[in-house]
Regions:
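Scaffold/interface architecture of coatomer-like assemblies
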Residues: 14-306
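Sec-dependent N-terminal signal peptides
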Residues: 3-13
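C-terminal end-of-chain detector
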Residues: 2-3, 306
């Protein structure tokens, strides 16, 4: 059954002051490691990693090369007018992605966003329900949703930041295990009630990794489009990265790459040492003993005040 993300404007305006409690006795970080050619390195040990928090070395207490923790995926799809010609491809590729990546104890949900955000399918492990949700993709969300507009009013644009904020704060914050947002868009935001930084903060507080898929319709833009700078910031801050659909990589290829990455992560846990009891954002840096390897992991987390 289709549902809507009905969040009052006042609650979104309050986003900067909202607090999501995080137990910082154990900080969990999921990291993927690639070599210069981009191949994933899957045979490292705990001793190959160094974890720094705010410049202080931390002792790794928990480590796993093959994380069997549940995986929760939010698939967020831009259905603004510039993306109209891509919707049918996204339906097919999205359904195939869920079939490939989801295991029995995993779950996923689907949100479309244009002038408003619409929850097409809530958290489920059912391939049938997820496929049905994807079939609900359509140009803009013109009824209900986050930003209802009176008859005759202009469309508000593409509320990309709001969609990310809501996916993290409303759907992922209470889930356990690994949490991933896959964001398919041309990278433009127009009309969101929250800022780019508020969307990133929401992802941090929910421990969500953002993988952005920069997808533009060549019939609209050629092979140009808007800048992907916002997508890079969201993804890199949370431990993900940006993929570009182009002549060499179609959407199905990129979904396969995302699947490989989330299944190639190391789970690293530590108890923060050498920190004051104050809250706020704490920076994390993860390195390997081999300087030629690239580590992809979130940049930090928000700690509670004791």
């Amino acid at each position: 059954m289709r549902g809507y993300l009905l969040i009052a404007a006042a609650s979104l305006a309050f986003a900067q002051e909202a607090t999501i409690k995080v137990d910082v006795d154990v900080v969990s970080v999921y990291a993927s490691v690639r070599d210069k050619r981009g191949a994933y390195i899957k045979d490292l040990t705990k001793d190959d990693f160094t974890v720094m928090e705010d410049g202080k070395k931390q002792e790794i207490r928990y480590f796993s090369r093959e994380s069997d923790l549940p995986l929760t995926i939010g698939l967020l799809i831009d259905v603004s007018r510039s993306q109209e010609g891509l919707i049918e491809v996204e339906k097919r590729a999205g359904a195939q992605f869920f079939q490939q990546v989801l295991r029995p104890k995993d779950a996923a949900f689907v949100i479309s966003f244009g002038s408003e955000a619409e929850l097409l399918q809530d958290l489920t492990n059912s391939q049938r329900l997820l496929a049905k949700g994807l079939e609900g993709l359509r140009l803009n969300a013109s009824v209900g949703g986050l930003h209802p507009s009176p008859t005759g009013a202009k469309q508000r644009g593409t509320i990309m930041y709001d969609a990310v904020y809501l996916a993290a704060a409303e759907k992922l914050k209470d889930e356990v295990g690994r949490k991933v947002i896959v964001l398919i868009t041309d990278g433009m935001d127009f009309g969101s009630r929250v800022s780019l930084q508020e969307a990133i903060t929401s992802a941090h507080k929910s421990d969500a990794i953002i993988y952005s898929v920069y997808y533009v319709d060549p019939r609209v833009y050629g092979w140009g489009g808007y800048s992907d700078s916002d997508l890079k910031k969201m993804s890199e801050e949370t431990g993900g990265r940006v993929f570009r659909v182009d002549r060499k990589n179609d959407l199905e290829d990129i979904f396969r790459q995302i699947q490989e990455e989330v299944r190639s992560q190391y789970a690293i846990g530590y108890n923060p040492a050498g920190q004051s009891s104050g809250g706020g954002f704490r920076k994390i840096e993860i390195k390997t003993s081999n300087k030629e390897l690239k580590v992809l992991a979130r940049k930090g987390y928000y700690a509670n005040k004791n």
